[in-house]
Amino acid sequence: MQCPYCQHTDSRVLESRSTGAGRSIRRRRECLSCKHRFTTYERIEFVPISVIKRNGQSEAFDRSKILRGMVRACEKTTVLPSTLEAIAEEIEAQLQQKPKRSITTAQIGDLVLHRLRQESEVAYVRFASVYRQFQGVDDFIETLSHLQDNAEQANLWIQTLNEDEESEDLTSPSVLTPSAN
């Protein structure tokens, strides 16, 4: 490891600790040339997940986008920021475990909706209104009426998504989609 002070390439490890729930290692090092101490972090590098947007374009997965959307949906609710951080981390971990390295924004939205519904129905409806692009009051009314009716269907779809790793069909119809009237 190169010393940030003198750029010498030899250092020794003084201390190592696991951090971030075992996802990274913090190492305290000492340069063998100038004796300065510095800290390095080692973490697993994941194969990037590609997100296919509604317009067909593809971009790298960005967990902060999920978090921003959930924070806006949960404003003035009892859902804690730490809970939202945990949900975003859980969704990212779930996606990292999948053998397929691409997912649609609709599927990510469904995963977020599923978790938000467990935390707050208000946050669920707020997120759904943006994610599903509600056009009017009828879309809200329909979603509210489907909130209880389709709970079982949503849970089954999420369970199928989690279990079906070999023949993963990432074009499953979304649940709770307001119909165009």
From Swiss-Prot:
Q: Which residues cross the membrane?
A: none
Q: Where are the zinc fingers (unnamed)?
A: 3-34
Cofactor binding, per record = Binds 1 zinc ion.
Looking at the record, the residues that make up the ATP-cone domain are: 49-139
The molecular function terms in GO held by this entry are: ATP binding; DNA binding; zinc ion binding
Q: Which UniProt keywords apply?
A: ATP-binding, DNA-binding, Metal-binding, Nucleotide-binding, Repressor, Transcription, Transcription regulation, Zinc, Zinc-finger
Q: What Pfam families would the database entry show? A: ATP-cone (PF03477), Zn_ribbon_NrdR (PF22811)
The record, for InterPro entries, names:
ATP-cone_dom, NrdR-like_N, RNR_NrdR-like
Name any cofactors this protein relies on. Zn(2+)
Q: Which biological process, per GO, is one annotated for this protein?
A: negative regulation of DNA-templated transcription
Q: Does the keyword Lipid biosynthesis apply?
A: no
Query: Which PANTHER family does its entry note?
Result: TRANSCRIPTIONAL REPRESSOR NRDR (PTHR30455:SF2)
Of which family is this protein a member?
Belongs to the NrdR family.
Q: State the function annotated in the UniProt record.
A: Negatively regulates transcription of bacterial ribonucleotide reductase nrd genes and operons by binding to NrdR-boxes.
Full protein name: Transcriptional repressor NrdR
